[in-house]
């Protein structure tokens, strides 16, 4: 208190606000700092930490074996694809480090990746897991929505715009990100002959993607929006952005078979028999650039995707593993949901096999597992929040096939869902 009986007014030493203008004023040796200035300092430190972490992360890059073992925690099977991806990604970020240190040395070219595999085999999950592991910006684009510049639809530069938005318009960070372009097979040209008419969503998009994938400086409108004359653009160099393209390439196996079955004629010709029993995934392993050209990709685009990884169709045992083993396994997710209602969920091995068989029959791969399990548990999840004394829900093979509802076990005695 001052001599006049009035309280001495204290001020923040940084912003000058009085103690009555802020929530809290913290005293130090002859200085004061308010809660607002502390919050501002925290924001500044928080912005600088990711940059330091990214630099430290790049200097301590995990080895291909370490990358593959981390992928194993999330993606079941696909060992060959994981090995190819691990080496390609490791070499890519090692190349960035080399370029930063040795600007005038041998220039290392970029190796973008093409993933070929049936739907639900893990193409997208592999790319997402890689980005999360390396702590780099990651964006997914759908090739089917892209058109040539000047036509209705998404411009290919929108992909880079999304990447910029992902890292709050930090250009340096965006220039070392990963872009995954899905459904790349859907922009194949309609025939293997060059088209005389404009193909704005097929071959035209492939042509537009060429420079972007190889490396160019893209002009991106700030904070999104359309391009306008006399507008300032954000310049993004795509040279160090890793592009991963993925597609199911349905029908490519027929192109490969027709090539491999071609033979000479006459008595000295080699006799080749059709191997109809060979799995699609096994046939795709024999894919050559000429097959992709025949399928409808232009040679220039294939040349810019030098690393090709083929994913196999998932078998029943692999689908069962996907349901239970990964960190974010589907069964674990539903068990967590049920635990929020204080109910235990048990899915028996026979039920897991039935789910896997159903997904195989539908030809939806791992992507179809959730819809099958969701359908089996729908009525139970609808009724359960309004029910009392339910301790456990048991799912068996008959529940998946639709013959019987899930078994509800109450605190006193077991009871079947839906019975009185």
From Swiss-Prot:
GO terms for molecular function: ATP binding; ATP hydrolysis activity; ATP-dependent protein folding chaperone; protein dimerization activity; unfolded protein binding; zinc ion binding. Residues 1-53 form the ClpX-type ZB domain. Zn(2+) binds at residues 12, 15, 34, 37. GO terms for biological process: cell division; proteolysis involved in protein catabolic process. GO terms for cellular component: HslUV protease complex. PROSITE patterns: CLPX_ZB. Gene3D superfamilies: 1.10.8.60, ClpX chaperone, C4-type zinc finger domain, P-loop containing nucleotide triphosphate hydrolases. InterPro entries: AAA+_ATPase, ATP-dep_Clp_protease_ClpX, ATPase_AAA_core, Clp_ATPase_C, Clp_protease_ATP-bd_su_ClpX, ClpX_bact, P-loop_NTPase, Znf_CppX_C4. The keyword Phosphoprotein does not apply. ATP binds at residues 118-125. It comes from the Bacteria. Keywords: ATP-binding, Chaperone, Metal-binding, Nucleotide-binding, Zinc. Component of the ClpX-ClpP complex. Forms a hexameric ring that, in the presence of ATP, binds to fourteen ClpP subunits assembled into a disk-like structure with a central cavity, resembling the structure of eukaryotic proteasomes. ATP-dependent specificity component of the Clp protease. It directs the protease to specific substrates. Can perform chaperone functions in the absence of ClpP. NCBIfam families: clpX, PRK05342.1. Belongs to the ClpX chaperone family. This is ATP-dependent Clp protease ATP-binding subunit ClpX. It comes from Dechloromonas aromatica (strain RCB). The gene is clpX.
């Amino acid at each position: 208190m001052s001599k006049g009986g009035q309280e001495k007014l204290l001020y923040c030493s940084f912003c000058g606000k009085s103690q009555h203008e802020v929530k809290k004023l913290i005293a130090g040796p002859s200085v004061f700092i308010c809660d607002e200035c502390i919050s501002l300092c925290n924001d500044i430190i928080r912005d600088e930490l990711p940059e330091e972490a990214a630099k430290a992360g790049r200097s301590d890059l995990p080895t291909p074996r370490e990358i593959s073992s981390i992928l194993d925690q999330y993606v079941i099977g696909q060992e060959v694809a994981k090995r190819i991806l691990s080496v390609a990604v490791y070499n890519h970020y090692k190349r960035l480090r080399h370029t930063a240190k040795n600007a005038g040395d041998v220039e290392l070219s970029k190796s973008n990746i093409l993933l070929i595999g049936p739907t639900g085999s893990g193409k997208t999950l592999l790319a997402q897991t890689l980005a999360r592991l390396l702590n780099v910006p990651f964006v997914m684009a759908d090739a089917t929505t892209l058109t040539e510049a000047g036509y209705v639809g998404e411009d290919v530069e929108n992909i880079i715009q999304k990447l910029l938005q992902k890292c709050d318009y930090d250009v340096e960070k965006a220039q070392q990100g990963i872009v995954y372009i899905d459904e790349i097979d859907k922009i194949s040209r309609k025939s293997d002959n060059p088209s005389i008419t404009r193909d704005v969503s097929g071959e035209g998009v492939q042509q537009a993607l060429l420079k972007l994938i190889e490396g160019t400086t893209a002009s991106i409108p700030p904070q999104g929006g359309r391009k306008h004359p006399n507008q300032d653009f954000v310049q993004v160099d795509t040279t160090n952005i890793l592009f991963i393209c993925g597609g199911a390439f349905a029908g490519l196996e027929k192109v490969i078979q027709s090539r491999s079955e071609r033979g000479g004629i006459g008595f000295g010709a080699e006799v080749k028999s059709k191997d109809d029993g060979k799995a699609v995934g096994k046939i795709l392993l024999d894919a050559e650039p000429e097959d992709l050209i025949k399928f409808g990709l232009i040679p220039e685009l294939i040349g810019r995707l030098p690393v090709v990884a083929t994913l196999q169709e998932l078998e029943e045992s692999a689908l069962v593993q996907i349901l239970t083993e990964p960190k974010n396994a589907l069964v674990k997710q539903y068990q967590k949901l049920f635990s929020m209602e204080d109910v235990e969920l048990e899915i028996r091995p026979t039920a897991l096999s039935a789910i896997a068989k159903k997904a195989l029959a539908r030809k939806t791969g791992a992507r179809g597992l959730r819809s099958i399990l969701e359908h089996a548990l729908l009525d139970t999840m609808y009724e359960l929040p309004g029910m009392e004394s339910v301790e456990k829900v048991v799912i068996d093979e008959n529940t998946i096939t639709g013959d019987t509802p899930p078994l509800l076990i109450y605190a006193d005695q077991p009871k079947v869902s839906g019975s009185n």
